[in-house]
Regions:
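Structured interface patches
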Residues: 1-164
Length: 164
């Protein structure tokens, strides 16, 4: 979605609503495309006393295997998108403002970039996920196993001293 910003920059108090669905199927995380259904983007672009801001909420369903136990998990994410828009930056790079020199905002690209930044680096089924047994591969969230953890060869000498 392209938003023409010229009238917004030139009209104090103007508020343009944004409400649409965006495909995020191209978002890739660890070789997977976890967002298959379209994301819902709802918000507005507003000129308030000459300060133009984009404020929106992005909502989507994230479906991927847990990084510890590999169980498929489906979770709904909602996060805010907030940017102050300027036609030109006065001094080099400034992360507080989003420069739109041609007064056109490609909202799809911006939301996709923000989604990539907002996604967790590790995706877990729950905070207390125990993962898989490194010996037999059982899901430790569902069952216990009798496997003995392999001993680090560097610590084996200390273990022998403790046994004596």
């Amino acid at each position: 979605m392209i938003i023409e910003l010229e009238s917004i920059f030139n009209t104090d108090g103007l508020k343009v609503p944004v409400d649409y669905e965006l495909s995020l199927a191209s978002v890739e995380v660890s070789g997977l495309n976890p967002i298959s259904a379209p994301a819902k983007v709802v918000g507005c672009v507003e000129n308030n006393a000459g300060i133009v801001t984009l404020t929106a909420k992005v909502q989507f369903v994230y479906e991927a295997p847990c990084d510890r136990c590999a169980v498929d998990v489906k979770r709904e994410f909602t996060f805010p998108v907030e940017h102050t828009l300027v036609v030109a930056l006065e001094s080099g790079d400034n992360d507080d403002f989003l420069e739109v020199p041609n007064m056109r905002l490609n909202l799809d690209e911006l939301v996709e970039e923000d989604v990539n930044l907002a996604l967790p680096s590790k995706y877990l089924c729950n905070e207390d996920c125990k993962g898989l047994c490194s010996v037999c591969g059982k899901n430790l969230n569902k069952t216990q196993c009798d496997c003995k953890a392999p001993i680090d060869p560097r610590m084996e000498v200390l273990l022998k001293l403790l046994e004596e």
